[in-house]
């Protein structure tokens, strides 16, 4: 069985690598597309915060996928079938995510792993193995994710345009409103961490909420101080070439330069969002790769399973996320940040705030939503705020198609790998 365990660990790293290549774009894609961060800066920031989130808080979410959708109870599912099934789920998820990343499709990692887990449950022809009620609840929440995310993004960006961008003096309007925006985004991002349960092992709900409120208050006053000493004269070379801001600067008027100052402030706020979203993603999505590994190890070696072993697995998963982002992450980042619709920092900020609010609200209601669907829906909402012509409908068609086939693709690949493993090891 040690050879099978080696295959499982390698498969876990491979899956984490592909999660990093595909899913991390949710955190940094809008920032890169808006020009707030270069691709290298985004990769560096995401690498640090993804790894920290995976190692420090990743263990909280691992039990959900390990036992939340498929029952490994001895009287229903034998240990051998459970090991083969979870290994097949790992490999199926990794392969499908690699295909999607190569094509630049931002698909849901959770869709893929759930489809893969359901696949081996179906091949066993044991309805008792699968918790169908939980699966149905998950599917309903996933369908709602892009709609809710897009709606919030539309409202937030419409407010920003009316309250700041369309004013005669957008800089003065931004100075008044920015402290409130920074406080709200810190509060929303903090709620994402609290309500997802990621910080539960470290601190209880009430103290965590007080800390988040304190950080929001600090962000409010720090933003007031920061804007007061902000360098208002922004030089052209500070704007990334090829972005929408670069084209605006080439036609610069007095209003245009004020608009550029406002966008630069939004760029700093967007960097904060990228850091928080990367940390939250690392703490949550490392479970998609590591939960099957942990479950298999505990089944094969129950006496030696401990928190130290889990920490090693989480570190391996965090390293896989970073490697995947650094190698193939640019493909999906390009899709989310540039190909759906043109983004500026104010639009990217609206995407980030909408995503944080949607995820926090869903977590408080107990809905395990797809972050990918929320972010893509939020980007779409920004596009709709500017009109249908602002959206690349061909890219949207490809993305939606990839969403529909992710679950069945994961299930089909899982069945193939399950049968192969049975043939090899039985």
UniProtKB/Swiss-Prot annotation:
One of its GO terms (molecular function) is phosphate transmembrane transporter activity. GO terms for biological process: phosphate ion transmembrane transport. It is found in: Cell membrane. This is Putative phosphate permease CT_962. It comes from the Bacteria. Potential transporter for phosphate. GO terms for cellular component: plasma membrane. It comes from Chlamydia trachomatis serovar D (strain ATCC VR-885 / DSM 19411 / UW-3/Cx).
